[in-house]
Amino acid sequence: NVSVQSFSLFFRISLFFFLYIETYGTTNHIYGGIPMKLSLETMITNQIKCHGSIQTTLEDDVNVPDTKPDIDFIIKQHGCLELTEITCEQNKCIVHGQLQFELLYASNDDIRPIHNMKGQIPFEETINMDSLSDTDTVFCSYDLEDCQIKLIHSRKISVRAIAGFHCQAEDETSYPAGVDIISDDAARAGMDALVPEGLHKRFDDISYTRSTPRQKDVFRIKDELTLPKGKPDIDTILYYEMTPVNLQTRLLEDSIRITGDLHVFVLYIPVDEERRMEYLETETSIDGIVQCDQCSEQMIPDIIFQPGCGSMEVKPDEDGEQRILEIELPLNMTMKFYEDVKLPILKDAYSTACELTLSKKPVTFEQLLLKTQNVIRVSDQIKPDDKQERILQICTASGRVQIDEQEIREDGIALEGIVALDILYITENDDQPLGSLNAVIPFQHFMEIKGISPEDHYLLQTDISQISVIMLDAAEIEAKVVLSVSAIVFTSAGCNVITQIEEAPQDLERLQKMPGIVGFIVSDNSSLWDIAKEYQTSPESIMELNGLTSEEVHPGDRLLLAKQVDGL
């Protein structure tokens, strides 16, 4: 039951194709289209070119300086790494630096029982990195897992530290992706895009995470602290620690604001001879700006802080009394910034005026899945062994976090690790006034990250936000530690992008073999676009011919298709 209107339309279409074949039947090819040009956009990502890691032992025997008294026993030790130079060569990099160490010790050879000693051990380590060249830039992170100082005899010590070095070089990768097809003449003339006749296009949006090249900087914390009124003047600084905590960053336009706190502990010999030792534990605020010409407020930061080796000097106040502490601590920064980008690309195209061939290339890219930060609270009760002096008062506590196991599981990352604590305290024994206690607190934690899979990769950072140590009695203390664990998670994605187009005259022989009108039954997974492309027509023509209001079709739908030829 075909209506008169439909019959009339079919007759006109059939007549058109009959006349078309009769007119052009003796021509091998037809081509009346406008020359076309593929408009390209470049996807730029920074990826790891090569990386390498080593764990090594830094050790040496060091003599006690002649100006220092004999060592009876070591109370506390501290070490830090300082990198001075990174040299790139073919397939390897060489890291130069020094291990700086400091120790507190007791001596019976002097009127004062507590003394200190400092020193440094230079090192040069080679890390193999395949594909590295001498023109690359290497970023190196490091960690001092353990620093032990043992007494050989009263005039010599053995320093032994386990250090890890993790180096990587990045490479900028670019992918050209077709975003449109326009008239070649218009493109050369700088005119607005002109759509060639008979060209049909489909677009899609791809979302990827664009990253800036990794860069380095140093944020120097400088401040002056004045002793409280109840504290005596300083004669000699014996020992100090400076630890940044609760560091926060905020991206501004072309700069980064850094805030937080600096925990400061100093043990010193006062000018007052009646008091043989004094200490101060305090905090000072951190607030500063680091310039960065590649960041903006909309970006997502990935900033790693690596505290360097600080310095503390005493200087006189306005009254000439030694009551001002001048402190400086460098924070080595490794920075990378991420930005989510939505790029409209040309997904597919064909022409009813010419033969259009598309060259496609598969590309892979990263998508930022999530950046999250968790707080972990751990606690334990610690008892010194019987050989240690009984605790009179706790001076300070420091610690480090060590992740031993990490595994991606369903909707999260499972972590296992320890918090290693080093506690300095005043004893009940005046002959041995200082003691230290080492303790290890294990912990487990599950970071909930919806949608994470084993194929994804992530970057993990751990920091200690707070340490609280209180005495329960002279033989037991309670330690509470607040940890901050942050993760930035990436997932891989991919698609095919059009990189080149090639146009040629239409093949008349092929067109002649195609029927002018086709009755088509929609099958599974068929789209109006695919049907139109296969049968030399357009989605708009199919919709008009079949009275459709949208491109949505369903299996079993019956369609009439009319062949379309443009550019004649």
Tell me the role of every PLM-derived stretch.
Residues N1-S3:
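Detector for intrinsically disordered, low-structure N-terminal pre-sequences
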Residues Q5-P35:
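Short, Lys/Arg-enriched N-terminal segments with co-localized hydrophobic residues
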Residues S8-F10, S14, F18, G178, ...:
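Acidic/proline-rich low-complexity IDRs
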Residues F11-I13, L19, T23, L103, ...:
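Generic low-complexity, intrinsically disordered sequence content enriched
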Residues G32-Q512:
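Interfacial loop/beta elements and low-complexity acidic/Ser/Thr-rich segments
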Residues Q506-E544, T549-L568:
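Primarily a LysM-type cell-wall glycan-binding module
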